């Protein structure tokens, strides 16, 4: 089936020096291999994540670059694409909340939960992507407050200005799903 290839790129101040390179600390410690193994664990646990296919870590001297290949989630769109209209679908937003809660209950802390890292698939399926720097502690429920605050900031940033009044309605439905 179709796949997605994602290169690991730096952001923030570190990107000034190098957009692609990281300090090489070994293949198993590389960001691409850590995310590959985490996705494999989450997929095996039945959580809605893309199935990992391959990881790449190339190094020269003390620097490395990396990439991750996953199966494409067909017919999926980022949650950001749903931020239109002034009447949000409460059912969809509740499913998003329930899905995030599943991850937290399973012990997953997502380092960058935002409207681009939540995919809406066919039949109200919700998937999370981009688990770079995420943490997984099976059997330990995660306090999701930080993740939810990050998502709320992302919603405020990406929601169209002329329809901002719909955001609290969507957020309330998301939290109702999360709290079920």
Regions flagged by a language model, labelled:
Residues 72, 120-121:
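Conserved hydrophobic "DFG−1" position in protein kinase catalytic cores
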Residues 1-77, 98-106:
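Conserved ATP-binding subdomain of kinase catalytic cores across diverse folds
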Residues 107, 112, 130:
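Conserved catalytic-loop position in the HRD/HxD motif
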Residues 90-97:
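Conserved short alpha-helix within the protein kinase catalytic core
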Residues 127-180:
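C-lobe/activation-segment region of protein kinase-like
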Residues 1, 121-123:
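Short acidic-glycine loop/turn motifs at beta-strand connectors
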Residues 78-87:
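AlphaC helix of the protein kinase catalytic domain
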Residues 113-120:
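Hydrophobic residue at the +6 position relative to the catalytic HRD Asp in the kinase catalytic loop
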């Amino acid at each position: 089936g179709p796949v997605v290839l994602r290169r690991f790129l730096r952001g923030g101040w570190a990107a000034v020096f190098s957009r692609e390179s990281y300090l090489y600390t070994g293949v198993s410690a590389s960001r691409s291999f850590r995310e590959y193994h985490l996705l494999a664990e989450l997929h095996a646990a039945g959580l809605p994540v893309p199935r990992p296919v391959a990881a790449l870590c190339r190094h020269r001297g003390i620097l490395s670059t990396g990439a991750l290949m996953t199966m494409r989630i067909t017919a999926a769109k980022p949650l950001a694409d749903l931020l239109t209209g002034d009447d949000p679908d409460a059912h969809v937003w509740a499913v998003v909340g329930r899905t995030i809660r599943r991850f937290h209950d399973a012990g997953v802390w997502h380092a960058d939960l935002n409207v681009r890292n939540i995919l809406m698939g066919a039949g109200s399926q919700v998937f999370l992507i981009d688990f770079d720097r995420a943490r997984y502690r099976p059997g330990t429920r995660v306090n999701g407050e930080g993740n939810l605050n990050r998502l709320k900031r992302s919603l405020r940033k990406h929601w169209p200005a002329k329809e901002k009044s719909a955001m609290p309605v969507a957020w309330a439905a998301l939290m109702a799903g999360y709290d079920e």
